[in-house]
Regions:
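Short edge beta-strand segments in beta-sheet-rich domains
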Residues: 26, 116, 213-217
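Active-site region of the double-stranded beta-helix
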Residues: 85-118, 125-141, 148-155
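Catalytic core of non-heme Fe(II) oxygenases with the double-stranded beta-helix
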Residues: 122-195, 228-233
Length: 242
C-alpha cells in the first residue's frame, strides 16, 4: 500500500511515496464449533447447578443489603474441569487449536508443552447486571471462550488494545464506527457454538448483561511450559516440611 505525498495526478516537487508495513499486530481467531454444543451444555449443567448453590451459601454470610440485592450483577462460576472425562473431546480440540494458534503466530514450541491452567464455565445471573470489568490473565499464553448460551440480547466480549504506549497517546478517531489502525477496542457478538482464541496478554471485558436470556460460556487459559521444567519434580516437594 502506497501512502503519503500528493493526492493529485501531478506529483509536486519533492514528492515521496511511502510503503506501509504492519508490525506488532494482535491476532484473534474466531470460528463456529457447534459439534460440541449439545454435549457441553448438558455437561456444564451440573457445574452451574453447583456454582449456584455455592453462591447462594456465600450470600448467607453477606450483609443484609447484599442479601437484598441477591445475585444481581454476579455470575455463577465453576471450578476448573479440564480433567472431566466427559469434556475430553472439547479439551483436546481446544488444546490442539491453541497449539496451532501459537505455531501460526511464529513461536517455536519444539521444547515446550502446553498446559491448561484454568478451564471453567460460568453463567451470568438471571437477575441481570452480570459483567466482567477489563482484565488480563497474567502469565498465560493463550486464552479463549466457547459460547454455550447467548443471543443478541445477552452480554458479549470486548477486547482492548494491549499496547500501553498506544493507549497513553491515543488520538480522536475520524469514525468511531469503523475499525481502523487507531481503534482501541473491538467487540464480537457470538452465537451458541462460537469459539474465540486470543493471546493471553490481551485485556478483555464483558458488557453488562440485561438478564433477559441465559448467557453461559466456557473460559480457558493455557500456558506454554519448557519441557525441561514440566518434566522436573516440583521444587515444592523437595523443601523441608515445617
Amino acid at each position: 500500500m502506497i501512502q503519503g505525498g500528493s493526492s493529485t495526478a501531478q506529483k509536486p516537487k519533492g514528492h515521496v511515496d511511502f510503503k506501509s508495513a504492519f508490525y506488532f499486530q494482535t491476532p484473534v481467531w474466531v470460528a463456529e464449533a457447534p459439534m460440541f454444543l449439545k454435549d457441553t451444555i448438558k455437561l456444564t449443567d451440573k457445574y452451574i447447578k453447583k456454582a449456584k448453590k455455592n453462591l447462594k451459601d456465600k450470600l448467607k454470610n453477606e450483609p443484609k443489603w447484599k442479601k437484598d440485592i441477591g445475585t444481581f450483577g454476579l455470575s455463577y462460576h465453576s471450578e476448573s474441569f479440564s480433567n472431566d472425562p466427559k469434556a475430553k473431546d472439547l479439551v483436546q480440540f481446544i488444546g490442539q487449536r491453541s497449539y496451532e494458534f501459537l505455531d501460526w503466530s511464529g513461536f517455536n514450541l519444539k521444547d515446550h508443552s502446553l498446559h491448561f491452567t484454568e478451564f471453567w464455565v460460568q453463567e451470568f445471573s438471571e437477575k441481570g447486571g452480570g459483567h466482567h470489568s477489563t482484565h488480563a490473565h497474567w502469565n498465560q499464553h493463550v486464552s479463549g471462550f466457547y459460547f454455550l448460551k447467548c443471543s443478541e440480547k445477552t452480554s458479549f466480549p470486548i477486547f482492548h488494545d494491549p499496547r500501553p504506549g498506544s493507549i497513553m497517546t491515543k488520538l480522536p478517531l475520524k469514525n468511531q464506527e469503523q475499525i481502523s489502525m487507531g481503534t482501541s477496542q473491538v467487540h464480537y457478538k457470538p452465537k451458541p457454538g462460537t469459539m474465540i482464541i486470543f493471546p493471553g496478554y490481551v485485556p478483555h471485558e464483558y458488557a453488562v448483561d440485561a438478564g433477559i436470556e441465559p448467557f453461559r460460556f466456557i473460559h480457558w487459559n493455557i500456558k506454554a511450559v519448557e519441557t525441561s521444567i514440566s518434566k522436573e519434580r516440583s521444587l515444592k516437594n523437595e523443601l523441608p516440611k515445617k
